[in-house]
Amino acid sequence: MIRSLPLVRRTLLLSVCGLFLFSGRLFAGNPLLMPSEAPYGAPRFDRIHAADIMPAIEEGIRAYKAGIAKIRALDPAEATFENVVVPLDRADSLLDVPRAVLGYLKSNFGGDSVIRISLESAQLTGEAYDAVTLDTAIFRLVKAVYDRRDAAGLDSLQLRTLGKVYRSYIRGGALCTPGQKERLKELNREISLKRIRHGQNITQATQEFVLYVQDSSLLDGLAGTTRQRFARNAARQGHQGVWAVGFTNGDYASVMASATNRDLRRRLYEAYTSRCMDGKYDNRQLSVDIVNLRLERARMLGYENYAAYTLETNMAGTPEKVRELLLPLKDAAAGKGRAERAELEAFAVKYERDSAFRLEPWDVAFYSGKLRKAKFGSELGRMRNYLLFDNVLNDGVFYVANRLFGITLTQRTDIPVFHPDVLTFEAKDAEGRPLGLLYLDCFVRKGKRGGAWCSRLRGYSCAGEREVLPLVTISCNFSRAAEGRPKLLSTSEVKTLFHEFGHALAGFLSRGPYPQVTG
């Protein structure tokens, strides 16, 4: 790996020598500040290394401040959508790629060095954005355009963009007093840094946990391939003749669904549900701090609580609307849940031939599988044999995208990636016009945060005739097959892949001249 930061695999090249003139400054071959010659202008992950990230972010901040200074010099009487809102919407464009690359590596690769850079970046960019959002002169210009919107002859997309920009300043604290603005800066900084640490603690605690099993009989019920994986886990950690069970790569789900030893299931369940409750990854105080800081910020901005603040710009709009939707469902859902639990417990009592048996949380997955087999004659685990990853992707996900939207996705092997796991695909519409690139990183790996998500390295943008196409990423944590074995998915993993690809479609199909309302 590149010296001083485990961002990319050891085979990566250092950036090329030479000087490049950008924004009036000289840079020694920083690939995050130079136009990429890769297809679609994709980031040169084969050249990016530690020393590139913060200089690129710092230069992006300098360019952002310079652009803001030009806007700030305008007279409110001369403020228009084109000379205020459009440049504000695009002022941080030079920050987009380095920040996205850092975020991608933080989520998908991890490591202490990445977190340190993320914390430094979050503080610098947060300060830069706060300085603009809380700038009275800038807000005066935005408000001048907003107040004259009805007479400006703006189309619906421009009005929506203007409205979002104006609301973002209100929600960011533009109307606060000078003293409140200083406190808001502190709150924003603390929330950002604590959230990064909170998320990293969960990732580290999840990936570092291991339960060593010395008696093979405790693994009864597990498939042979699962036992072999546990043995390989232990061998990699220098232990022979034992089995190492973790929380990643399907270990936890396999034990909870298949292990007949109830105490093993209990131990693993209790360890999983008590992550970050003590020790060096203790998140309890961090969680309290984040909740209280968010509440203070929301109330300073005029909201009753954080829920009211965050829902205002979402579909529901208010906590009351959420309650109106959820509360009528509560009784019906709770009743159905109690009935299903009673059925499952009755089945477990019969299965165990023990009238005193009481269902516990670590029993649910195990007996649910047994009940499903008894009722329907099948096991979900066996479906995996028919769900080959390549087939699900090409004959499932991509096939549906083509049938519904006429989109085709073709694998590209000439796009730089940061890890061999990452696959890249070129998306085109029904007429063969390019839509962008998809980066697919589906399998569990040390350092990658848990869950599944869709993000982007670059959003769609256009300025006149110049069009920049999106670079969309999908990241998952599917169970990794043993070397030489086929990559098979569970039914849950198949649903996850379809779900995340739905987000990717939004990234490919969203078009418009203003970043505020595209992507």
How would you describe each model-predicted region?
Residues 37-52, 102-121, 144-186, 246-285, ...:
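Short His/Asp/Glu-rich catalytic/ion-coordination signatures at enzyme active sites or charged loops
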Residues 157, 161, 193, 200, ...:
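Active-site-proximal, well-structured secondary-structure segments within enzyme catalytic domains
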Residues 492-507:
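Active-site recognition of the HExxH zinc-binding catalytic motif
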Residues 434, 510-519:
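Acidic/histidine-rich catalytic neighborhood
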Residues 2-13:
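Bacterial N-terminal signal peptides that target proteins for export
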Residues 382-389, 482-490, 518:
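Active-site rim elements
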Residues 11-25:
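Bacterial N-terminal signal peptides
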Residues 29-225, 229:
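N-terminal helix-rich structural modules
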